[in-house]
Design a protein with these regions (language model features):
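Intrinsically disordered, low-complexity terminal regions
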Residues: 1-188
């Protein structure tokens, strides 16, 4: 009896185990990125746009580019296992505009050339840390909770609706609108 249940136990363990192999995801050119439903995305400088799943799988995570040039990352489909972990690395010659919806985190890494403008947004929870981006102007919006961390050189246009935080570093001119709670504050 022990012999017959052992393969079933091993199969159940294998099905529930996280997928750890890296996977290069072919996607067409994009101008912006939206992470939906959780996960961690690192945006790093590179010679071409490239998306790599470091932890997770395209079995459960769907990525596609909309007509407007937005790379959408749907973290978990209906077959997603419990405790599914998603980590993605996006390489790009320029920093794309960034958005998180329904949880998750996007972090930019240093080494990008200075940008003229960067737009970042969080809707329904999540975090974007773009402090490593040297952008002249930043547009930042939080709706329904979340946090944005940015470093604009000249100007910041920030909006918070229904809770959330926009924190900025440097000494930009700041225009802000806060409705229903939230903060736009200098970082330290």
């Amino acid at each position: 009896m022990i012999r017959s249940t052992l393969p079933l136990f091993a199969l159940a363990l294998a099905i529930s185990a996280p997928v750890l192999a890296t996977e290069l995801v072919p996607v067409p050119q994009f101008r912006s990125v939206e992470l939906r439903g959780g996960g961690d995305v690192a945006v790093v400088p590179g010679p071409v746009e490239r998306v790599t799943i470091l932890e997770g799988s395209t079995q459960f995570t769907h990525m596609y580019v909309e007509n407007d040039g937005q790379l959408r990352i749907d973290a978990c489909n209906e077959r997603c296992p419990r405790n599914y972990q998603l980590r993605i690395q996006i390489q790009s010659p320029r920093v794309p505009n960034l958005a998180v919806s329904g949880g998750g985190q996007i972090t930019t890494m240093g080494g990008f050339a200075p940008e003229g403008h960067l737009a970042v947004a969080v809707n329904g929870g999540g975090k974007i840390d773009a402090r490593s981006v040297d952008a002249s102007e930043v547009s930042a919006a939080v709706n329904g909770g979340g946090e944005l961390l940015v470093r604009p050189r000249q100007s910041l246009a920030a909006a918070v609706n229904g809770g959330g935080n926009v924190r900025y570093w440097g000494h930009p001119s700041v225009s802000m609108a806060v409705r229903g709670g939230g903060n736009v504050t200098a970082g330290y």
